[in-house]
Amino acid sequence: MLKPLGDRVVLKAETEEEKTVGGIVLASNVKEKPTTGKVIAVGEGRTLENGQKLAPAVKEGDRVLFDKYAGNEVEYNGEKFLVVHAKDLVAIVE
């Protein structure tokens, strides 16, 4: 499994519907990039100047909102994931 370093978080982005409410199929260039995802793994956190670690405020299994253009897409074992910095996470969805 992927183990993020520092303050990075691995997400499984939630995909949007491929059809509109009216049943129109959307082309791939029209669909918005996902902005919600499930936390798969969390790094140890960033190191502060005094040497202490500041862990990200999320945990595995959380559903989160993130900035639209945040992170890097990676493929691992045939699955696509998004690796983002904790600062790019906007909120936890409850």
Swiss-Prot record:
The keyword Chaperone applies. Keywords: Chaperone, Cytoplasm. GO terms for molecular function: ATP binding; metal ion binding; protein folding chaperone; protein-folding chaperone binding; unfolded protein binding. PROSITE patterns: CHAPERONINS_CPN10 (PS00681). GO terms for cellular component: cytoplasm. Belongs to the GroES chaperonin family. Heptamer of 7 subunits arranged in a ring. Interacts with the chaperonin GroEL. This is Co-chaperonin GroES.
